[in-house]
């Protein structure tokens, strides 16, 4: 049974669908997830702790038998899972979404300057993530696999610390984009492209939070 003293990130690790519940009430399960459910609920207004626990325990009871929980994968398999489920989809989405973000800024930015700032923030986020994921694939993940296999990797703690720092910076950019877009709520005057960009940026935020959680709270714990 999930209780108020359980750590937010650990609950999401054990029950991945709990991420949807925490997200719905604005609780960070990613870089800020190392606090208890009770402490996290106290940081938010209008979050009833008992109701939150009930929703979480409903998920526990309905957890689908046989569904894949990445926490049970070894380091090599988990890395392959992360690359297939997050790295490749993110690269593809960046390629497809960027022209729409650019168009939105160009067409509506002159009358809505925050859309220009949104594009600049998105570009920083995109370029940072692309560089970060490539470095993980080429340099960092092979080191984690070597460490799992018993080889000596002198800088393993530095590798993890640097990746976590990158994740924190990524989280800050996501917060900024969410703030600029009023949590991705398009204004009444928004055209189809505007609404499309907001919808896909929100989905990108969800994917990135899940991605970072899996690395910070599952993968890195296996090698630290």
From Swiss-Prot:
The keyword Cytoplasm applies. Keywords: Cytoplasm, Iron, Metal-binding, Stress response. The keyword Metal-binding applies. One of its GO terms (biological process) is protein repair. It comes from the Bacteria. GO terms for molecular function: metal ion binding. Its main location: cytoplasm. It is found in: Cytoplasm. One of its GO terms (cellular component) is cytoplasm. Belongs to the RIC family. ScdA subfamily. Homodimer. NCBIfam families: FeS_repair_RIC, PRK13276.1. Di-iron-containing protein involved in the repair of iron-sulfur clusters damaged by oxidative and nitrosative stress conditions. This is Iron-sulfur cluster repair protein ScdA. It comes from Staphylococcus aureus (strain bovine RF122 / ET3-1). The lineage of its organism: Bacteria, Bacillati, Bacillota, Bacilli, Bacillales.
């Amino acid at each position: 049974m999930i209780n108020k003293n359980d750590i937010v990130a650990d609950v999401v690790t054990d029950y991945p669908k709990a991420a949807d519940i925490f997200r719905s009430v604005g609780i960070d399960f990613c870089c800020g997830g190392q606090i208890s459910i009770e402490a996290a609920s106290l940081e938010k207004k209008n979050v009833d702790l008992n109701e939150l626990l009930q929703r979480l325990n409903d998920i526990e009871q309905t957890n689908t038998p046989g569904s894949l929980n990445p926490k049970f994968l070894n380091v090599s398999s988990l890395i392959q899972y992360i690359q297939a489920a997050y790295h490749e989809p993110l690269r593809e989405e960046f390629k497809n979404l960027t022209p729409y973000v650019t168009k939105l800024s160009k067409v509506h930015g002159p009358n809505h300057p925050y859309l220009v700032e949104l594009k600049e923030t998105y570009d920083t986020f995109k370029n940072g993530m692309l560089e970060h994921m490539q470095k993980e694939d080429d340099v960092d993940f092979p080191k984690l696999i070597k460490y799992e296999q018993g080889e000596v990797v002198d800088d393993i703690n530095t590798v993890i610390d640097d990746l976590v720092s990158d994740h924190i910076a990524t989280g800050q950019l996501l917060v900024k984009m969410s703030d600029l877009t009023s949590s991705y709520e398009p204004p009444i005057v928004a055209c189809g492209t505007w609404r499309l960009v907001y919808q896909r940026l929100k989905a990108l935020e969800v994917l990135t939070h899940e991605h970072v959680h899996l690395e910070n709270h599952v993968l890195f714990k296996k090698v630290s």
